[in-house]
């Protein structure tokens, strides 16, 4: 669209006029830029029209005009312009840099021209030089306002970053101008650019005789004053500049050129001795970068001072507490703060970069005196704190230095390892002065803790260094020097560590810890470079395994040994150590799995399972071995119980299954190819149950049944469909062979159902529970044989009181196909047929409904199930079981989006009425079950009908139930005639609304908030409903913290406050009191006029909460009192 001349003038006037809004000015800018972009207006025409605005003596108009032209150019960076126009514009904006009133526009224009795309016409080197000279001569950066300063720095950054070759000839002038421009800058955004400018400037002038070298002192004086960075800006700054970013920028600036070395290193060493932790951290980080970038030749002169400062930093940042806990086996054993970590990093950098620095370390007097300390104090606890600190620091310094490189490791070992072995009693000097191994070292009664700690640190350093080499390299010859020393002493070292492990006196915890840690370190040397032979490695495994299998209970040494074995197993698996894996399998895994399969291991079975599962989880082959072992152990123990009535065996089965489910199944799920192993385990469970015809004695094995159900669910849930079918077929064959099928002949009539008793044998109950678990976890694509008979069986057992049967029925109706091409869990039963069996209509005569599904399906109050729920049968037990079963069936239907759930919901609602269609007054227990049925329907279940167990889940199913049920419950609450019915209706409503997504609540807050408040009031009268009360209170809390809910809360403020005040003294649940006080604080977001009238009542109620027996409640009360006390009558009422 072409801009007419009069429109262009209007746009120009709008932008220049400072009285116009920023949005109007932006619109004018966009309109002009768009015209230029689509060539309906040329840049020449625009400049001609703007001549008056660009040259007028009115400073404000001229500044706005120049800024407009600059902003337009910024929008057209990719639009081609010919060289003449670009050259002219460069000249114009370079000249305007002298016009301080138009400085902003001039800087924006220069930046826009410098950033033009290559294909669109760019500035020439001559133009760049002219612009740079104009800037240096005319722009006093520090005299500008913040925005203009930032633009000026960005212009300098662009010159250095994109046009560096063009400005190289400016030399001294450029460096001097840079110093002048950045001197005294304080704004964080500008400083980020300033530090980058120095970093960009350094590589332009690398010559020792260049301008940067001669002016390095002045430039460093300008930036050095910022170190260490003192950052006071808040987190609310728009630019969101962090101290870490600024500090990193300053670090890069300081280390950018070696010409800063004479000034930077002394400054950094001085700040390293500061008492401010942040100064120490910044100094250490900067020294590390400087060491790398300045080079060895420049750093050498500072080595003495560096070592002294670094050593002092190690001493000041290290505590004297050395942990001997299990978690410390794979760590140094003491807390490392940021200062310590950065000191370690710097030391490693210095040693790795120049091996001569290691001379300062090795020759230090404290390195030599540490051996006297070790010898003087054999026990760590006997050491005074200065001695403990000395041992820990020197050990850390030597370990870090050894880990820096192969050469440094060799030097460290050659300097102190023999002396350390002598201190530990492993070597001794003969009369001729020769050093030989002490043959009696293993029987020494004194173990030097400091020496053991230093030895382990050095061994760990050597081990970690070897791990860094994937294979032997040309430098591995150097590695032999240090490793050969370890190899020559590996046998006595392992003996010393083993001796420490075997200590059994009261003061042996440190001995045991250091012994196990030493064995662990020796056992984790890698591959061909390992100084530990296979025989010695196996001796380590034997020692640690013998501790696990010893009949000594769960002691400290047992836990340490287990942790060490797990670490070694993980190490073997990670680095694919095939030889070590064979040893680990035969010595550790086989022994522990054998114990797990044994009924007479002499140890608590839980300990054996814990050790075996932890060890075997470290590798796929070990997992496979354990699952097979557990399968054998399960069959053996279950058989022992069936035959001999050994209750210890059935208890072992329970623990075994829990171990399999909780420890191994998650690991198996991560490993490809092990699924069939679990399927075989599940089928073996069924075979063993089938083989054991009857118990030798009856028992109440609820724990075993629950463990077996959980395992079966998990295994079936992760199995493939074909594998699920195999398990289902085996399970069905076992069910068919027991006494359970006899119940299929029980007619679904009141006469037959009233005679039902919960009288299944323990074996039948186990079979039923396991079969229900299989059905619960099966995929919709799995095939269930003889589904109609099984549905009848599950329905009867449901009415006998077995909840797993109800959950299985809910899962079946959730996954069954519709019979018309839908997903089929069973080939011989459609969803309609299943519902026909469950909701049996023709009950009076005792006739079954037609199995071909031709009869009309009625789910409402005329079905057998619904009449049982409504109390027609006269049996309270049967009534409550039917209600619970109906809830699980309804949940399955609801999740798949089947409309039959509405009829089920209506039956449950009918049970909540004071006068229902049955004409009978329902028992309070039945009404309670009906109310809680809505919790089953709406809440998420861990044991069935979830994604893990392949449930069919239709989106928004909870929202649909909410929209259907809530209006019905609301109407019934309003018309309820008894307090019991009213309470139960509120319980049902609470279950519904506390289980829907919060967005649903917020969208309906205006309607729901009065109901929630009434519900809180009603439910607070009965302690039985305390958990339901809390869930409802959480819903209210969610509405009070959202803007949608606050709008409704404003209208009900007096009722809400009154309700919450009562709940602050609710005696039955602490979290109710705590949450109600938090809600009172949230109410302060409401308009002042709504809440201020209740200030006195709230403060009086909170005074009582200050004496609450629970600390959390008292803390919330203090916050609430302070918040409510702070509002005054003069606060803003709008």
Curated annotation (Swiss-Prot):
Keywords, alphabetical: Cytoplasm, Nucleus, Repeat
Entry GO CC: cytoplasm; nucleus
Family membership noted in the UniProt record: Belongs to the MET18/MMS19 family.
Subcellular localization, as worded in the UniProt entry: Nucleus; Cytoplasm
Annotated function: May select specific target apoproteins to which a Fe-S cluster produced by the cytosolic iron-sulfur (Fe-S) protein assembly (CIA) pathway is transferred.
Transmembrane annotation, as ranges: none
Subunit note: Part of a complex composed of AE7, CIA1, MMS19 and NAR1. Interacts with AE7.
Disruption phenotype: No visible phenotype.
Location (main, coarse): nucleus
InterPro entries: ARM-like (IPR011989), ARM-type_fold (IPR016024), MMS19 (IPR039920), MMS19_C (IPR024687), MMS19_N (IPR029240)
Protein name: MMS19 nucleotide excision repair protein homolog
Repeat region (HEAT), residues: 959-998, 1002-1047, 1050-1089, 1092-1130
GO BP: protein maturation
